[in-house]
Amino acid sequence: MFSLDTDDDTTPAATAEPRNSYLEEKAFKSRTLLIFGGITDSVAADVTRRLIALDADSAEKPIDILVSSPGGHLESGDAIHDVVRFISAPVNMIGTGWVGSAATHLFLAAPRERRVCLPNTRFLIHQPSGGAGGQATDIAIQAQEILKARHRIAHEIARETGKPVDVVLADIERDRWLSAQEAVEYGLVSRIIERKTELHR
């Protein structure tokens, strides 16, 4: 996903769209997608559409996804996660900036050997949260769904990192921040890279 600040008065509005289209085209041709900022339904729709298009273009060539996101809507992250696994083309996940919450979940869609990060990336794992309102029965239902999501996320992290589920459940009870090296040790990523040339070794 690309975003240009069109509110900047120093940038003529007429040049914003061509510049955006140029960047979009260059990124697409290089089979590179960006997930930056909050994960929403619109972001999920955009990313999954591009994944399917790139997979149709070539099911053998890898797709690179750079992720720098605080997270967002869990089900939107689920959509990206599942489509990454649904397509045939291999996907490389590249963490940069920070990868947190629902973004960590979609990051884990790639096999461990295809999960890398840049040196200053930080990761955040924690349990899902949500606001509960309405009648008491509705609040109880929402609370139950959050507990289900918590266990689902814990099992996914455990499966993809090799950590015991009970350890992951304890780790996500509160915010758990990890540096790039700590993420490697935890199993979230396979290695830290500094150059693009290191990605496809």
What do the predicted segments below correspond to?
Residues M1-R201:
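Terminal-region recognition feature
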